């Protein structure tokens, strides 16, 4: 069975990706910077995963981790809206360049990159968004800018077949970000409901995003493509 390296393996999405791959017979190398969090991942349904402690911003780490690997899912990123531009560029852009270099050196069959639909964000409503509806000059924040630049790096490189996945608004068991923060804020002071809360949001069950990433590994037709991933069930924000 094929061997897959997953960066960002102990992140919210990464944990589900590791378990999804293991459940379908893949050998998985779970890559991350903190051994204790990788060990916690292994204890939480990923017993068969091989652990690799490292930083994909260090070329020697990611190159060593990719040795003998058939596929790489690059889910690791600096994914906050706060911070210095230099940190986003180092992690999300130059880090991705190092992952690509590691894939080339190890002759990896395919790289699946986890991007973000945040790149579509603007100061107006966006509905029925297609994968091509991206403004390459969008600099609304450093995270968005870094993801756009990382995608540009992937499109312009040669030698590593790539797939780009943009999963929207993940939720599920183990989420410590979007939904818990909204609940906490609402309990503390209430959340302002613009347009009475009738504005639409599209969120995605994390299991569906993990499935999409596995299918991106398996499908030859996916190579060179970009995919928005959502549940396809827009809901009013107040719901």
Task: Please provide the spans of the model-predicted regions.
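Alpha-helical substrate-binding/gating segment
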Residues: 183-191, 199-235
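Glycine-rich "substrate-gating" loop/helix at the edge of Rossmann-like oxidoreductase active sites
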Residues: 140-141, 168-176, 196-206, 233
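N-terminal Rossmann-fold cofactor-binding loop
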Residues: 31-35, 55-56
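N-terminal Rossmann NAD(P)H-binding glycine-rich loop of SDR-like oxidoreductase domains
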Residues: 4-24
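NAD(P)H-binding glycine-rich loop region in Rossmannoid oxidoreductase-like domains
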Residues: 50-94, 102, 122
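Conserved Rossmann-fold NAD(P)-dependent oxidoreductase catalytic core, especially the SDR/UDP-sugar
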Residues: 94, 98-142
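Active-site Tyr-X1-5-Lys
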Residues: 138-163
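Flexible, glycine-rich beta-alpha linker
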Residues: 121, 160-181
């Amino acid at each position: 069975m094929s061997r897959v390296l997953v960066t960002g393996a102990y992140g919210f999405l990464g944990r589900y990706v590791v378990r999804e791959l293991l459940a379908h017979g893949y050998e998985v190398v779970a890559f991350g910077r903190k051994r204790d969090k990788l060990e916690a991942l292994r204890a939480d349904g990923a017993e068969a995963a091989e652990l690799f402690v490292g930083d994909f911003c260090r070329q020697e780490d990611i190159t060593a981790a990719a040795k003998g690997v058939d596929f790489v899912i690059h889910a690791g990123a600096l994914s906050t809206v706060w911070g210095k531009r230099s940190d986003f560029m180092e992690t999300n852009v130059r880090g991705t360049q190092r992952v690509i270099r590691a894939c080339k050196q190890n002759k990896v069959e395919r790289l699946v990159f986890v991007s973000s639909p945040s790149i579509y964000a603007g100061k107006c409503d966006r509905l029925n968004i297609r994968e091509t509806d991206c403004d390459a000059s969008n600099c609304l924040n450093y995270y968005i800018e870094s993801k756009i630049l990382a995608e540009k790096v992937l499109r312009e490189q040669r030698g590593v077949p790539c797939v780009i996945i943009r999963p929207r608004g993940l939720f599920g068991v183990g989420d410590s970000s979007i939904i818990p923060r909204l609940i906490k804020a609402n309990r503390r002071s209430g959340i302002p409901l613009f347009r009475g809360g009738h504005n639409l949001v599209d969120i995605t069950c994390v299991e569906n995003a993990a499935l999409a990433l596995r299918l991106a590994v398996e499908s030859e037709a996916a190579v060179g493509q970009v995919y928005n991933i959502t549940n396809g069930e827009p809901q009013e924000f107040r719901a």
